[in-house]
């Protein structure tokens, strides 16, 4: 169900934390909720304060409002222009889609991203976009124009190359191969391209064969960096994902409870997983340095490397 809403501001400042230093301080979400239906999505919490959550049915079927009720911010352009045009705005990097995918199914009808990107081009404002949809190719030319003016980072998220598993985990996202086509297409622009290999799901997508296939394809696409991260479970996401496992992979439910006694996976598991990832990234000569391309384009001091993530839960 789509519901149109009005907002008073478009950009949200991210609260500083001691856990990790992000390369951006501002989020822009043109939708609230996401129709891709990824069963591990960390952003399910974003509906809770609206008191719009739907509880699981007695039959145990998923019935998550985050996937079913999508709020469309129809005046996002006006709100965004007001903030970008303010004298106090310093053209900081904006992360587009912090708690939703900006190219989710609703975007095919509303086309808000085209207007947003045109405005970003007018103001020459740097942006980061991560998606699981090849709908972003619709805006290839717009993003290419913006990338000639300032820093643009186009990243895709890939968790598995197994289409059957991907369809189960991420029902309405584009197939994995189509996501890689996005990376290939954007290499003919000045945009930075990246692979977000997250979340890696224990017992489902963490097999070395799957990790190597994804990393090797990213290398073929000549991405500027790859950023892996293991699954983190808390709040609504934890409840939803365990329910998903019970319905689809009951044999690994108990191992998950043991591995995730807290929000993050067991440290021993993570250490071994990142050892494998480090080896594979070295084998395929993939950089884990997220910040280097941004430094080059914007002349900003170094803040973040892949190694910063290895000790943290993503």
Language-model-detected regions and their locations in the chain:
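Surface-exposed amphipathic alpha-helices with a cationic face
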Residues: 144-147, 183-188, 278-282
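Short beta-strand segments at enzyme active-site cores
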Residues: 95, 130, 193-197, 226-229
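Active-site glycine- and acidic-residue-rich loops that bind
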Residues: 134-137, 202-212
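Conserved Radical SAM active-site core
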Residues: 1-31, 35-155, 159-167, 176-180
């Amino acid at each position: 169900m789509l519901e149109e809403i009005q907002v008073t501001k478009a950009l949200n400042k991210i609260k500083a934390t001691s856990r990790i230093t992000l390369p951006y301080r501002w989020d822009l979400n043109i939708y609230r909720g996401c129709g891709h239906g990824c069963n591990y999505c960390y952003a399910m919490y974003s509906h809770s304060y609206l008191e719009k959550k739907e509880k699981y049915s007695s039959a145990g079927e998923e019935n998550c409002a985050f996937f079913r009720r999508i709020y469309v911010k129809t005046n996002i352009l006006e709100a965004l222009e007001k903030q970008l045009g303010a004298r106090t705005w310093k053209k900081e990097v904006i992360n587009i889609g912090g708690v939703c995918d900006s190219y989710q199914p609703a975007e095919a009808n509303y086309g808000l991203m085209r207007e947003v990107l045109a405005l970003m081009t007018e103001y020459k404002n740097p942006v980061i976009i991560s998606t699981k949809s090849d709908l972003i190719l619709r805006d290839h030319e717009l993003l290419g124009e913006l990338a000639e003016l300032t820093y643009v980072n186009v990243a895709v998220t890939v968790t598995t190359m197994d289409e059957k598993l991907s369809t189960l985990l991420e029902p309405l996202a584009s197939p994995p191969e189509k996501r890689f086509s996005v990376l290939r297409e954007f290499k003919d622009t000045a945009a930075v391209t990246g692979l977000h290999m997250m979340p890696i799901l224990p017992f489902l997508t963490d097999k070395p064969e799957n990790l190597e296939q994804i990393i090797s394809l990213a290398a073929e696409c000549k991405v500027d960096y790859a950023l892996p991260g293991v699954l983190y479970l808390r709040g609504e996401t934890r409840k939803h994902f365990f329910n998903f496992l019970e319905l689809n992979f009951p044999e690994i439910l108990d191992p998950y409870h043991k591995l995730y006694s807290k929000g993050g996976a067991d440290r021993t598991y993570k250490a071994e997983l990142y050892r494998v990832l480090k080896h594979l990234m070295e084998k395929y000569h993939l950089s884990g340095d997220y910040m280097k391309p941004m430094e080059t384009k914007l002349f900003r001091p170094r803040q973040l490397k892949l190694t910063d993530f290895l000790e943290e839960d993503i």
